C-alpha cells in the first residue's frame, strides 16, 4: 500500500486505535515507521491529543527527539510517517541487558563497557544516555514544553552512528533532518537516545501550573499522584526515576497502584537507597537523590540540572577509542561546524532475516518527533523545518540520486476540533513489537512457582513478593492516565492490580486466561468482545466517543466473558432490547419521543451493546430472577454471587440508558463502521439538519436528561461492584488468603472464585470507562441543547437557580428538570414491562420474551432498591433485611421502597408461574427446540433474538 512517497510494509505493532507498520521510501529504499490511526475509533479527546501531538512534532527538530517526517490524512485514517528506531526502548534495553552482548548492534558496546554484576548498565552508558536526555529536555524547556510522560518506554534507541561506518547495519532509516542521527552530545560509538510520544506534551511556561493527571504511575511525580497542581519539575522527578532504573535495574518505587505508590514515596522520606553491591558513583547517586525529592520546591531545578557536573563534565572511564581528540560539543564556530563535512552517521533497522535474538530487540516508535540541535545557532536553525534527507546505504545497489537532499513537500495538517474535557480519557496505544513469548515466559515462571500448592516457606514467600513487585512493574508499564477523575483512576488501578496479580493468575494456564492485559505483549490486534459478526467490527465497547477511557484501557484484552446470551448475531442485543422495548409503543413515555421502529439508527440498544452475562456456573442461572437461595455458601462464593448480581443490575440500567443514548446519536460509530451503512453515512454528513436525528430541541433536552441520570445510576452500581471486589481483595491480602486454607482446598473453589471475580472486575472496568465517556458526551449534549431553548423556557441556562443542580450525581454545571430521576424512570419502565409481559402471557404471545421481560423488570427494580453500602460478610440474613428496610436510597423514600419490594415479589411470583408453564410446553413439544408454539403470535420484529439458555 502506498502512502505518499512511502510503501507500507508489514505490521510491526498495534494499539487500541492505531497500527504501526514498517515502511520504505519508494525511491531511496530507506526505512520509516508509519503509524496509521483509525479515525473512527477516536473520540473527541483522542483526536485532540493526536492534533496536539502533530502540532508539537511539526515544530520540533532535534537529534534526540524522534522526528515526524510526514503526515497524510484520508477519510478514514491519519498516517504519521516517523523516524525508525531499531533498538527498541530503554525499558527493553535494561530488561535484556544480559543478552546485549549477543546482538550485533550492541556487542561492541558491551565489549568495551560491560554491565556491572551489581547494577543495570555500565555507568559510561548511563551518563551517555543521561546527557542525550538532558539535551532534549533543555530544548523542550527553551520552548516552555513539558513532556509529562518521561519513562523508559518513551525513550527509544537507535544503533550507534559509528555502526554504519563499520558496515554492521544493512537497513538504513530515512532521516527526518540533516543531523537527525548526529548526536548533540555523548558518544558516537554508543546507541543514540531519542524522546518519543508527545501525546501528553503541552506548553507550560515556567510560572504556570497544571493539574491534569498524566503519565505512568511508576514514573509519576508525587505531586501528580496527590492530584495537586504541578509544574515542569514533574519531568525532573521522572528523569530521576529513569536514571535510578538505568543504574539499579528497577524503578525506585514499585507498587500495585498509584495510592500504594504514593504511600511508599511518602514513607521513604526522601531516603533513596541503593543496593550495597551497586557500583554507581557518588556523583550519580547524589544527582538521583536531588531529583527524587518529594517536595517539588526542594527538588533540583532545571538550570541546576543542566549545569550538573554529570551532565556537563566529560564521561569518565572511556576506552581509548572513545577518547575525544578535539572538543566536539559545542563547536567553536557554528557556521564552520555546519560547513564541516560530518561523518556519514546513520541509524538502521534490524534486518528481517536476522537471528531470533536480534529480532526480539526490534521496536517501532509510537507517536514521535524529530530535530537537530547544534548550539549556539539552534534557535535560528530550528525555527523552520530542515530539509528532509535520506541516508545512503554503503555498498548498496540502490544508489540514491546525485543530489543528497530531497525536499519534503509542505505537510498539511487538518484543523482538529477544540478540546473538550472528559471525565475520563483513553490511554494511548502502545505501538510496540514486544517479544510476547519472552514476556509470557517471564510471567509464567512466577506463576508456576506459586501454583505448585506446596506449603508456604520462606523461599516461596520471597518468590511471591518478587512476583508482586514484577506484577506492579508490569502494571505500571501498561498504565497511562489522561484527565482522569479520581474514581476512574481507582477503578482502573484496582482492575490492573487484580489482572496482574500472580495469586489470581497462579493456577491458570496462560491460554485459559480471559481477563489478562495484553497490550504490550500482544501486537496482533484487539480481540472482539463477541465472536458474532456485527460485534467483530466494533472491537471495544466504546462507540460514540470510542476509545479507551482508561486506562487504558481500552486494554487490548480478550473479553472477560466468552459466553453470551446466545450465538446468533442478534442475541447479544435482543435479550435486553426485547425486554426494554416490548412494553409499549410509547418508547419513552413521552409524546414527542419517536418510536424505535422509525429511528434512523435501527434497533436499540446499538450493535455494540454487550450485556453482562452471569458467569456460567452450576450454582447460578444464566439469567436469574434475583431470588435468594438457601444453599450454604462460603465467603468467596458469596462474593462472586453478590458481585455478579450487582454487575447484572448495572447492565440492565445501562441497557435502558442506551435506548435513550441511541435516540440522541442515531449514527454511532458502530453503525458508521458497518459497511452496509456507508451510503447512509455520507448522506447524513451532507445534511446537517439530520445531526440530531430529526428531534426537536425539547426532545433532545429530555432524552439527554434521562440518559444522563441513568448513566449516573449505572456508574454508581459499577462503582459498588468494584467496592465489593476491593473489599474481598483487601481481606485476602490481610490474611494472605490465597496461601491459607481457602486456597489450599482440594476442590480449588477459591481459585475459581478468584478467577471469576477477576473476570467480573475486568468487565466492570471496561463498562465503567465506557459509561464515563458516554455520560460526558450526554452531559455536553444536554448543555448544548439547553442553550438552544427559548430564553423563557424553564430549562434555559439563564433560568437555572444556583441551587438547582441535580442531586443524583450529575456534574455541577448540569441542571436537569425537576422530577427527572433514574429511580422514577426505572420504576416506570419496570412496571410497564411487567404489565405488558403479563398481558402477553395471558394471550400466549411470546412466552420466552415474557420471561426476559420479567427478569429484566426484577433486575431493574432491584437496582432501584440498591444502596451504595458494601455487604459485610458474617452478617445474618435477618439483620441484613432489617437494615435494608430502613435505608433511604437517593430518591426512594421508605414508603416508596416498600411499594417497590411488593412489586418485585409480585413479578417473581408471575415469573415462577411462567417458568412452570414453559416447562410444561417444552415437554409437550415434539422436538427439543426453543421455538415458540405455532399457535402463538409471531415475535415482534423489533425484539427478534435468541432466547437465553436456561
From Swiss-Prot:
Amino acid composition bias (Polar residues), ranges on this chain: 370-389, 447-458, 511-520
Presence of the UniProt keyword Lyase in the record: no
Keywords from the named record: ATP-binding, Autophagy, Cytoplasm, Kinase, Membrane, Nucleotide-binding, Protein transport, Serine/threonine-protein kinase, Transferase, Transport
Gene3D superfamilies documented for this protein: Phosphorylase Kinase, domain 1 (3.30.200.20), Transferase(Phosphotransferase) domain 1 (1.10.510.10)
GO cellular component, one term: autophagosome membrane
Localization annotation: Cytoplasm; Preautophagosomal structure membrane
EC number(s) per entry: 2.7.11.1
Enzyme class, UniProt record, top EC level: transferase
Catalytic-site annotation from UniProt: 149 (proton acceptor)
Example GO BP: protein transport
Region entry Disordered, spans: 314-425, 443-467, 505-570, 671-690, 926-950
Keyword Kinase: yes
Residues the record lists as binding ATP: 12-20, 35
GO terms for MF: ATP binding; protein serine kinase activity; protein serine/threonine kinase activity
Biased composition (Basic and acidic residues): 549-565
SUPFAM superfamilies listed in its UniProt record: Protein kinase-like (PK-like)
Membrane association type: Peripheral membrane protein
Reactions listed under catalytic activity: L-seryl-[protein] + ATP = O-phospho-L-seryl-[protein] + ADP + H(+); L-threonyl-[protein] + ATP = O-phospho-L-threonyl-[protein] + ADP + H(+)
Main location, first listed in the record: cytoplasm
Domain Protein kinase: 6-311
Protein purpose: Serine/threonine protein kinase involved in the cytoplasm to vacuole transport (Cvt) and found to be essential in autophagy, where it is required for the formation of autophagosomes. Involved in the clearance of protein aggregates which cannot be efficiently cleared by the proteasome. Required for selective autophagic degradation of the nucleus (nucleophagy) as well as for mitophagy which contributes to regulate mitochondrial quantity and quality by eliminating the mitochondria to a basal level to fulfill cellular energy requirements and preventing excess ROS production.
Subunit comment: Homodimer. Forms a ternary complex with ATG13 and ATG17.
Similarity section: Belongs to the protein kinase superfamily. Ser/Thr protein kinase family. APG1/unc-51/ULK1 subfamily.
Name this protein carries in UniProt: Serine/threonine-protein kinase atg1
Organism in which the protein naturally occurs: Neosartorya fischeri (strain ATCC 1020 / DSM 3700 / CBS 544.65 / FGSC A1164 / JCM 1740 / NRRL 181 / WB 181)
